[in-house]
Curated annotation (Swiss-Prot):
It comes from Acropora millepora (Staghorn coral). Keywords: Secreted, Signal. Transmembrane segments: none annotated. Residues 30-50 are annotated as: Disordered. Its main location: secreted. Residues 1-23 form the signal peptide. This is Galaxin. It is found in: Secreted. The keyword Secreted applies. One of its GO terms (cellular component) is extracellular region. Pfam families: Galaxin_repeat. The keyword Secreted applies.
Amino acid sequence: MKPSGAFLSLCVVLLSLATHCFSFPSDSLRRDAHSDTNALKSRDRRQAPAPQLSCGGVLYNPAAEMCCHGNVEPRVGASPMCCESSSYDPSTQMCCEGTVSNKPPGIAMCCGSEAYDANSQICCNGNINTKATGPTAQPGCCGEFSYDAASQLCCDSHPVLMVGSLPSCCGRNGYDANTSLCCGDNNVAFVSGPQAACCGDMGYNRNTHLCCDSNVLPMPAMGACCGSWTYSQQTHLCCEGVQLYKGMNTGCCGAVGYNQVNSLCCEGTVVPKSPSKPVCCGTTSYNPLTELCCDGIAFFKTGFIRPTCCGGAIYDATVARCCDGVPTYNVASCAGLA
């Protein structure tokens, strides 16, 4: 009995299914092997240690850390930088003289080791101050202080308010130079006018007062100063700071009064005056007709044809020469004399 056509067809289908279930194509095997190899390599990469560098003798991971002047610091922000031995994030922080500060709003600047906002603050000699504001403000520094040059003066590195029509400084004080004087280093004297003047630290009117050794005193008639006091030149003399009653012929000889008719004042010494000795020679009186005064010493002219002074001595110029202040005899000239 021969198999039918339907039976043969069924056998072919069954044989085809069996072949498909138990066959392994070579290209599929190659793909699976390649996938396994890549997975192993990826795992090996994840497990490999990160490269390390040295910073001051200490190893660090450059992916998470950075070396700042020999100090290992963490990386902060997207573009970290070093501030001396510290790391910082320049997008939110500032490095001011080696110190990390949070960046302020506005125009961020450094004032010494601190950060400040230049829109609202001002740095004066390393000190952060509030900046002067207003439509007419002229902000600036006065020493270590902030001031407004439109309404203030800077007096001795200190801000003071402007006063009057001619504001000026008197030490650390402000004053109106049209109505006051600055006397001494910092004293404001409230005097004015063409006769206003200073007497030490005080102001005074020169029409009514005198300044005697920094003392302001009422002015007497024909008044003048004698030391620290006033006196009347009508009735008194002032002899080197000493007041003396004024006589008809009284004069001063140092701090002493003397009669100018019968006395002489010779180099601060009162000596008798006579018709024979009417003038001074040093601290004594002498007669210029009969005597010669040489360096404060009186010599008689007797015996000299042409009496002449040579230093502190007298000599006869007809028989000698004066060589270097010494009378020298029997020489034609002083040349060659030692």
